[in-house]
UniProtKB/Swiss-Prot annotation:
Keywords: GTPase activation, Ribosome biogenesis. Residues 20-30 have a biased composition (Basic and acidic residues). It comes from Salmonella arizonae (strain ATCC BAA-731 / CDC346-86 / RSK2980). Belongs to the YihI family. This is Der GTPase-activating protein YihI.
Length: 170
């Protein structure tokens, strides 16, 4: 009888054959040739990176940098565009004029009346009143004016001094 034939065994489990120098060089050339063709096509940066496919598609994809939708008049126009004027700084008033404005300020008068009536103002109004009163004091000092109350006190002191002198100098 015939002996059963065994299947041929693969040589994968055995010792692998070393590649020769020529085979290694050829594989390196193949890798280099494949590597050369990697990357973008030349001119892709200027073309927008999208390959043109189809003739009808070109009308839709126009370069947005070219042209403008707004019409530009080429002739001389009669209408002159008004230039925006920058806001001028506040006019500097003379100290006397500024003092007159502050003394006739309705808001300041109303808030001072509320204070005299015993009401308490919120912080914002109180700060505003204080600032305006300080400004009035500065302007009065610049102009050499003084409060009527101070003048009355000075007159009273002068009269008292006169009375002391008349009575005997004590």
């Amino acid at each position: 009888m015939k002996k059963p034939t065994s299947a041929p065994r693969s040589k994968a489990f055995g010792k692998q054959r070393r590649k020769t120098r020529e085979e290694l060089n050829q594989e390196a050339r193949d890798r280099k040739r494949l590597k050369k063709h990697r990357g973008h096509a030349p001119g892709s940066r200027a073309a927008g990176g999208k390959p043109a496919s189809g003739g009808g598609n070109q009308n839709q994809q126009k370069d947005p940098r070219i042209g403008s939708k707004t019409p530009i008049p080429l002739g001389v126009t009669e209408k002159v565009t008004q230039q925006h004027k920058p806001k001028s700084e506040k006019l500097m008033l003379s100290p006397q004029a500024e003092l007159d404005l502050l003394e006739t300020d309705e808001r300041l008068d109303a808030l001072l009346e509320r204070l005299e009536a015993g009401e308490t103002l919120n912080a914002e109004d109180q700060a505003w009143v204080d600032a305006k009163l300080d400004r009035i004091d500065e302007l009065m000092q610049k102009l050499g004016l003084s409060y009527d109350d101070e003048e009355d006190e000075e007159e009273d002191e002068k009269q008292e001094d006169m009375m002391r002198l008349l009575r005997g100098g004590n």
